[in-house]
């Protein structure tokens, strides 16, 4: 599977365990660079944006390859919308 810069991805990292939703910048032998938020914050993040409340922004980060357990493209599946589609439906904004 080929990933491109700008793809919306879900990254699972270890040591410590993290799940991130973000916009991929690059993948290199050394690691992954992406603009992301913690996936556990997604619902609160969307709610805060809709309510016009203060919220954390996506941040640019580099994750060394030894921490990357899995990288998946954020895609819809059957009746389940992608995280990016859910974000757009809930906030009226595009992710990325």
Protein language model features and the residues they cover:
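Conserved RNA-binding domains used in RNP assembly and mRNA/RNA metabolism
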Residues: 1-96
């Amino acid at each position: 599977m080929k990933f491109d810069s700008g793809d919306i991805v879900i990254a699972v990292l270890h040591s410590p365990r993290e799940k991130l939703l973000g916009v991929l910048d690059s993948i290199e032998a050394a690691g992954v660079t992406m603009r992301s938020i913690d996936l556990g914050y997604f619902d609160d993040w969307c709610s805060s944006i809709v309510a016009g409340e203060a919220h954390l922004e996506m941040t640019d980060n580099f994750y060394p390859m030894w921490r990357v357990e899995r990288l998946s493209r954020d895609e819809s599946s059957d009746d389940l919308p992608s995280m990016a589609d859910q974000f757009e439906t809930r906030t009226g904004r595009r992710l990325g």
